[in-house]
Amino acid sequence: MPENPSSSPTEPPEQSAAFEKWRSGLAQFTGLGLSESEKAERERLKAQGKLAKDWDKCEGWKRDLMNYSPMITFLLNHLKLAGCPFPSSAMQCHPCPENRAGGFSPDHGILLCQDRFFNKKHMEDTLAHELVHAFDHCRFKVDWGNLRHHACSEIRAANLSGDCRFTREVKRGFYAFNKQHQACVKRRAILSVLANPACTSPEMAEKAVNEVWESCFTDTRPFDEIY
């Protein structure tokens, strides 16, 4: 009996399974041809994979900086000398909102925003900034609810960490050459103090920064001068 030309030959089960695996893999790669539940699962897995990738990169950079960065090793050594050794476990990598790169908490240590760093240098500046806060908390017993105390540490951290170097300011859109460093330190200190729950207005933040500016801007401890 002649074969019906309109009928397709049936594939062996192993070939059919191989094709389905290929089709499913391609769909997951492109996002095309997926059901809504499959799309949601694909996005969940992508986000999960990105979190793991970001965390691995952040932890790797942290190890490198703790071992090889002159700035970071200097600050860690002086924290140890001050009686407050700062282990790797006190510097945690986590995802963060868009408007921050790190943070310091007396109770929890340093937050490194694993998904917000442009490069390792950005992370180095951020870690140095937070380690200055840690040093101040250890050495000077900062009362973080006191706006003048907070303002002083923010001035020192912005001044000493590299956070206000010219190239960073250019990326932020600030191009002035005359006293650019001082302007950056003051601007960023005011913004940080403004986020303090005890601060109720921009004017209050600016007043706190101005009141301690002279003594805190010139205080470069534990450095001999601005790095």
Swiss-Prot record:
It is a peripheral membrane protein. The gene is ATP23. The active site is at E130. Has a dual role in the assembly of mitochondrial ATPase. Acts as a protease that removes N-terminal residues of mitochondrial ATPase CF(0) subunit 6 at the intermembrane space side. Also involved in the correct assembly of the membrane-embedded ATPase CF(0) particle, probably mediating association of subunit 6 with the subunit 9 ring. It is found in: Mitochondrion inner membrane. This is Mitochondrial inner membrane protease ATP23. GO terms for molecular function: metal ion binding; metalloendopeptidase activity. Its main location: mitochondrion. Belongs to the peptidase M76 family. InterPro entries: Peptidase_M76_ATP23. Its EC number is 3.4.24.-. Keywords: Hydrolase, Membrane, Metal-binding, Metalloprotease, Mitochondrion, Mitochondrion inner membrane, Protease. A divalent metal cation binds at H129, H133. Pfam families: Peptidase_M76. It is an enzyme of class 3 (hydrolase). One of its GO terms (cellular component) is mitochondrial inner membrane. One of its GO terms (biological process) is mitochondrial protein processing.
